[in-house]
């Protein structure tokens, strides 16, 4: 397994729409394993393949405190959503920035697991929010897209400044 490079906003590759996975095979399973390693190394709770410049419909999530409840979503589909909630979300592709994002309080999805077996899942609370956040990545949407243009511009400027400082270091 290896840690993959996470793309950072405003990189245009984050806006690409991910293609469905045609077959879950050893290559896809290796991508899933590398994504988990990357997510844990970056101290995240979710990661979409788009964020590591792999434009396939793959998501990994682990919202558990002990980091021992891995969830793999390949070709996820949203079946139902209900209620309203929102928390200050962060994103590995938008480092050190957080913002309140409106989300459904509960979701029901269908996806394939790491072995290509279909399953359905009902989720609420943090898991539902994380699923929605990561599914947004698969269609090129970021949490900053829910913000006002002014807030989005401020975040972009902060990240561009951080990138310049890091390039000099």
Curated annotation (Swiss-Prot):
Its cofactor is Fe(2+). Belongs to the polypeptide deformylase family. It catalyses: N-terminal N-formyl-L-methionyl-[peptide] + H2O = N-terminal L-methionyl-[peptide] + formate. InterPro entries: Peptide_deformylase (IPR023635), Peptide_deformylase_sf (IPR036821). Its EC number is 3.5.1.88. Binds 1 Fe(2+) ion. The active site is at 134. It is an enzyme of class 3 (hydrolase). SUPFAM superfamilies: Peptide deformylase. It holds the Pfam family Pep_deformylase. Fe cation binds at residues 91, 133, 137. One of its GO terms (biological process) is co-translational protein modification. Gene3D superfamilies: Peptide deformylase. The lineage of its organism: Bacteria, Pseudomonadati, Pseudomonadota, Gammaproteobacteria, Enterobacterales. GO terms for molecular function: metal ion binding; peptide deformylase activity. Keywords: Hydrolase, Iron, Metal-binding, Protein biosynthesis. CDD domains: Pep_deformylase (cd00487). Removes the formyl group from the N-terminal Met of newly synthesized proteins. Requires at least a dipeptide for an efficient rate of reaction. N-terminal L-methionine is a prerequisite for activity but the enzyme has broad specificity at other positions. The keyword Iron-sulfur does not apply. This is Peptide deformylase.
